[in-house]
């Protein structure tokens, strides 16, 4: 009897559940058949939610990929530089293990070492790891690119020059050698540049030396000076003085004519002028032609050419007004001039000046 009583409520419960399920199915069917807009709305919402979930999954995947790539790049940089303490840890490592921050900053120069780093160093027996040895042996780019063999030991010189004075002395010696080589090279270039003008000057000096050999000797110049001093002292000059002065005047005229024949006006073909000028084309013209063209903007006519130089009349001054023109003043001026041993041309020019002074004095004395 008891078993039959227990089976009866179980059957009743199962029947009630089945009836409830059937009622719900009927309700859903009636609602679906009654409202199609709600069904379409639910469908669109499901599609949008699925799209959003897929996009969120893609973003998460990309973030994980970027984080992993960044960690790889940091590890590569740390392996190349050989110092794991220069770069901060990644955010994932700091979140996962906070103790790693203390480990990474344990061996920093600017901070006090932690107990963990000190204990780890003591456990290793104070010996460096093979990774640190390798990083120490790696040469810097400066030492690798340096042409000097001893420059590889200068890694610590930049920070502390007194720690390795031998390397510092080697560097100073190398710098001095480079400076000496540069100075020698510069000196050689200057000598090569100076050789060309020196050769030109030597060739120019040879020509006047030949002309000097043809000039009168120093003894002849001394005799001329003696005769001049006798003339100023009041003694009558010997006939040799007149001959020498005439010869000197003739030779000076020949020299002036030879020198002036080189210069010639391109407009009027004159060879005597107070100053030489250049026209617009760069040709050589006399002073008169140049001034005429500047004033009238036309070339000077040929019929206006003059073979002599026109001089303005100047007021003649007496000897009292101008004592510098007296014989004593002229003689003292001649004695104060430079020596006559440089060449015969200087003596000839002095003779011409003396003749001109004598002529001017005679003209003043004449009524």
From Swiss-Prot:
Alphabetical UniProt keywords: Metal-binding, Nucleus, Transcription, Transcription regulation, Zinc, Zinc-finger
Biased composition (Basic and acidic residues): 1-16, 114-123, 193-210
Task performed by this protein: Transcription factor. Binds to the sequence 5'-TGATAA-3' in regulatory elements of target genes, such as lin-39. Involved in embryonic development and in vulval development in larvae, acting redundantly, at least in part, with egl-18. Perhaps acting together with egl-18, may form a positive feedback loop to initiate and maintain lin-39 gene expression to ensure proper vulval precursor cell (VPC) fate specification. Together with egl-18, acts as a downstream target of the Wnt/beta-catenin asymmetry pathway, required to adopt or maintain the seam cell fate.
Matching PROSITE patterns: GATA_ZN_FINGER_1 (PS00344), GATA_ZN_FINGER_2 (PS50114)
GO cellular component: nucleus
Official protein name in the record: Transcription factor elt-6
Record's subcellular location: Nucleus
Organism: Caenorhabditis elegans
Disruption phenotype: RNAi-mediated knockdown at day 5 of adulthood (earlier RNAi treatment causes worms to become sick) causes extended longevity and also increases expression of elt-3 in the trunk hypodermis; longevity effect is suppressed in an elt-3 mutant background. RNAi-mediated knockdown at the L1 stage has little effect on the average number of seam cells per side, but the number is reduced in an egl-18 mutant background. RNAi-mediated knockdown at the embryonic or L3 stages reduces expression of lin-39; expression is reduced further in an egl-18 mutant background.
């Amino acid at each position: 009897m008891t078993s039959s009583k227990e089976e009866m409520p179980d059957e009743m419960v199962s029947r009630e559940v089945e009836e409830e399920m059937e009622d719900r199915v009927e309700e859903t069917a009636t609602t679906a058949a009654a409202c199609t807009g709600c069904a379409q709305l639910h469908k669109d919402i499901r599609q949008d939610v699925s799209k959003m979930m897929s996009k969120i999954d893609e973003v998460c995947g990309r973030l994980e990929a970027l984080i992993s790539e960044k960690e790889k790049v940091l590890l590569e940089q740390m392996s190349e530089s050989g110092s794991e303490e220069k770069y901060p840890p990644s955010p994932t490592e700091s979140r996962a293990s906070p103790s790693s921050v203390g480990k990474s900053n344990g061996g920093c120069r600017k901070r006090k070492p932690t107990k963990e780093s000190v204990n780890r160093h003591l456990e290793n027996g104070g010996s460096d790891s093979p990774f640190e040895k390798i990083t120490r042996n790696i040469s810097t780019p400066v030492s690798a690119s340096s042409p000097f063999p001893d420059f590889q030991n200068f890694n610590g010189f930049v920070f502390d020059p007194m720690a390795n004075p031998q390397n510092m002395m080697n560097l100073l010696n190398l710098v001095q050698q480079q400076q000496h080589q540069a100075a020698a090279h510069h000196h050689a270039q200057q000598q090569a540049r100076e050789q060309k003008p020196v050769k030109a000057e030597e060739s120019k000096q040879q020509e006047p030396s030949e002309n000097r050999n043809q000039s009168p000797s120093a003894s002849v110049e001394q005799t001329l000076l003696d005769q001049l001093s006798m003339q100023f002292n009041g003694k009558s000059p010997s006939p040799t003085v007149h001959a020498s002065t005439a010869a000197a005047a003739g030779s000076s005229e020949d020299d002036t004519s030879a020198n002036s024949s080189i210069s010639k006006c391109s407009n009027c073909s004159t060879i005597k002028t107070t100053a030489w000028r250049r026209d617009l084309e760069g040709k050589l013209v006399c002073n008169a032609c140049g001034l005429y063209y500047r004033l009238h903007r036309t070339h000077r006519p040929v019929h206006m050419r003059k073979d002599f130089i026109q001089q303005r009349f100047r007021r003649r001054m007496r000897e009292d007004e101008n004592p510098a023109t007296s014989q004593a003043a002229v003689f003292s001026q001649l004695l104060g001039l430079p020596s006559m041993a440089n060449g015969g041309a200087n003596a000839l020019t002095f003779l011409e000046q003396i003749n001109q002074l004598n002529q001017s004095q005679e003209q003043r004395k004449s009524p």
